[in-house]
Regions:
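Short, surface-exposed linear patches
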Residues: 6, 24-26, 46-48, 101-103
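Phosphate-binding beta-alpha-beta segment of Rossmann-like dinucleotide-binding domains, i.e.
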Residues: 20, 28-76, 88-91
Length: 110
């Protein structure tokens, strides 16, 4: 069995797996909330520069120069796409007190 920890399976040769009687399974969809929360975690890491602070502490450097972030409250956040993940991200950002601007992507049938 090949168990993929992702939604896509384009990196597996399905015909070859079938010929060798190997089952292929995948995650059909991730939790939109989990993905949105991870995006917020990355946003906070970049904003508060915790990745830089972590590296400095490991180097025994405890200076605060260049580590100042800013409050998200009152800031404008732009979100492209309002699928399940985009909606979950918007709800979290609204909870931070941000103004949220949305762009809805539409597929036009021409």
């Amino acid at each position: 069995m090949i168990a993929l920890r992702c939604a896509g399976f384009n990196n597996v040769q399905l015909e070859t797996a079938k010929q060798h009687n190997i089952r292929v399974c995948r995650v059909p969809a991730y939790s939109p909330e989990a993905v949105a929360e991870h995006a917020v975690a990355m946003l906070l890491t970049l904003n508060r520069k915790t990745h830089k602070a972590y590296n400095r502490v490991r180097e025994q450097n405890f200076t605060l120069t260049g580590l100042l972030g800013f409050n998200l409250h009152g800031k404008v956040v732009g979100v492209i796409g309002t699928g399940n993940i985009g909606k979950a991200f918007c709800r979290i950002m609204l909870g931070f007190g941000c103004q949220v601007l949305l762009t809805i992507l539409l597929k036009l049938m021409i």
